[in-house]
Curated annotation (Swiss-Prot):
LRR repeats lie at residues 59-80, 85-106, 109-130, 132-153, 159-179, 185-206, 207-227, 230-249, 255-276, 280-301. Residues 1-16 form the signal peptide. Residues 17-58 form the LRRNT domain. GO terms for cellular component: extracellular space. Glycans are attached at residues 74, 137. InterPro entries: Leu-rich_rpt, Leu-rich_rpt_typical-subtyp, LRR_dom_sf. The gene is TSKU. The lineage of its organism: Eukaryota, Metazoa, Chordata, Craniata, Vertebrata. Pfam families: LRR_1 (PF00560), LRR_8 (PF13855). Induction: By 17-beta-estradiol. This is Tsukushi. GO terms for biological process: anterior commissure morphogenesis; bone growth; camera-type eye development; cholesterol efflux; cholesterol homeostasis; cholesterol metabolic process; ciliary body morphogenesis; corpus callosum morphogenesis. This factor is named 'Tsukushi' because its expression pattern in chick embryos is similar to the shape of the Japanese horsetail plant, tsukushi. Keywords: Developmental protein, Glycoprotein, Leucine-rich repeat, Neurogenesis, Repeat, Secreted, Signal.
C-alpha cells in the first residue's frame, strides 16, 4: 500500500464503541498517528428524566441529552466528572421553561449548545459568559424579549452563530454602549419567524449574516440597518405584513453581497433608488414578489450585481455588451439582464441599460 494512503488512514478518525451507562451509547473516535488521540460521543437521548445526572466517561466531547422530558438543568447537574470538558451539549426537545444563570458556568470548553424545541420563556443575563461558545441554538422556544448582552461569551473574539428563530420575540434589547463592556461576537443571527414589527437595533455587532424572514415588519426605512456595515447576507423572505421599502433603506449596507426578498407577493416597487448604496450586492432574490418587470435603472444602483432570481425557475444574469469599438469618449458599455426560464430553457430578451 502506498505510504501516502497509509498516512491518511492513520491520521483520519476511526470509530469504536465502549461500555456505557445503561441505555446510553458511547462511541469513541480516535485520531492521529497510531490512534494517539481519542474523544467520546455519548448519546443518552430518549431515556427519560430519571437518568440525570448521568455518569459519562472523562474524555467525553459531546453529550446528547435530547428528548428526555427534562424540566430543569443547573450547575450541579452539569458539574460531574466528564462534564467540565464538554465541547458539545444537546438539550433539545425537552421540557425546559427556564435555565439557571449559572447552569453552564463550569463548562469552560463548551463550543456548541443546543436548547431548541423547549419552552424557554426567558434568557438570564450572562448565561454563557464562562464558555467559549461558537454555536447556540435557541430556536422553537417561547422567548418574547431577549437581551443581546446575554450572548457575551468567553470566546476571545471567536465568531458566534445564534439561532433564535421560531420564538415569540417582539423586542431585542440592544447591547449597552457603556465603555469597557465588550459586545457579543455574533456574526450569524437567525431571527426568522418571530413577532418583530421593526428591524431591531443590532448596532456595532460584527454581523455578517442576518435573517428576519417571516416577521411582521411594517417598514424598512433609512437607518434600519445602521451600524451593520459588515453585513454580507440579509434575508427578508416571507414577511407577514406588506413591508414598505423606503428609498435608501439599505444605504448603511455597502458590503452586502446577498439580499433575499423572496416570498413577498404584495411587495411593489418604490423605485430603484430603494437599492441605492448597495455597491457590493451580487445576488438578489425577488422570486415570489410583485417586483417584476425590473426597472431599467436597477443596474445603475447595483454596479456589482451578477444574478437576480425573479421566479421559481427564472434567473437573470448580468450581461455586458461592449458595443462599437473604439468607444466614443464618455460612453460606457451597455449593461443588460439576460433572463432564462430553466423549465423550458427559453431566454427572455435582455433589458439593455
Amino acid at each position: 500500500m502506498p505510504w501516502p494512503l497509509l498516512l491518511l488512514l492513520a491520521v483520519s478518525g476511526a470509530q469504536t464503541t465502549r461500555p456505557c451507562f445503561p441505555g446510553c451509547q458511547c462511541e469513541v473516535e480516535t485520531f492521529g498517528l497510531f490512534d494517539s488521540f481519542s474523544l467520546t460521543r455519548v448519546d443518552c437521548s430518549g431515556l427519560g428524566p430519571h437518568i440525570m445526572p448521568v455518569p459519562i466517561p472523562l474524555d467525553t466531547a459531546h453529550l446528547d441529552l435530547s428528548s428526555n422530558r427534562l424540566e430543569m438543568v443547573n450547575e450541579s447537574v452539569l458539574a460531574g466528572p466528564g462534564y467540565t470538558t464538554l465541547a458539545g451539549l444537546d438539550l433539545s426537545h425537552n421540557l425546559l421553561t427556564s435555565i439557571s444563570p449559572t447552569a453552564f458556568s463550569r463548562l469552560r470548553y463548551l463550543e456548541s449548545l443546543d436548547l431548541s424545541h423547549n419552552g424557554l420563556t426567558a434568557l438570564p443575563a450572562e448565561s454563557f459568559t464562562s464558555s467559549p461558545l461558537s454555536d447556540v441554538n435557541l430556536s422553537h422556544n417561547q422567548l418574547r424579549e431577549v437581551s443581546v448582552s446575554a450572548f457575551t461569551t468567553h470566546s476571545q473574539g471567536r465568531a458566534l452563530h445564534v439561532d433564535l428563530s421560531h420564538n415569540l420575540i417582539h423586542r431585542l434589547v440592544p447591547h449597552p454602549t457603556r465603555a469597557g463592556l465588550p459586545a457579543p461576537t455574533i456574526q450569524s443571527l437567525n431571527l426568522a419567524w418571530n413577532r418583530l414589527h421593526a428591524v431591531p437595533n443590532l448596532r456595532d455587532l460584527p454581523l455578517r449574516y442576518l435573517s428576519l424572514d417571516g416577521n411582521p415588519l411594517a417598514v424598512i426605512g433609512p437607518g434600519a440597518f445602521a451600524g451593520l456595515g459588515g453585513l454580507t447576507h440579509l434575508s427578508l423572505a416571507s414577511l407577514q405584513r406588506l413591508p414598505e421599502l423606503a428609498p435608501s433603506g439599505f444605504r448603511e449596507l455597502p458590503g452586502l453581497q446577498v439580499l433575499d426578498l423572496s416570498g413577498n407577493p404584495k411587495l411593489n416597487w418604490a423605485g430603484a433608488e430603494v437599492f441605492s448604496g448597495l455597491s457590493s450586492l451580487q445576488e438578489l432574490d425577488l422570486s415570489g414578489t410583485n417586483l417584476v418587470p425590473l426597472p431599467e435603472a436597477l443596474l445603475l444602483h447595483l454596479p456589482a450585481l451578477q444574478s437576480v432570481s425573479v421566479g421559481q425557475d427564472v434567473r437573470c444574469r448580468r450581461l455586458v455588451r461592449e458595443g462599437t469599438y473604439p468607444r466614443r469618449p464618455g460612453s460606457s458599455p451597455k449593461v443588460a439582464l439576460h433572463c432564462v426560464d430553466t423549465r423550458d430553457s427559453a431566454a427572455r430578451g435582455p433589458t439593455i441599460l
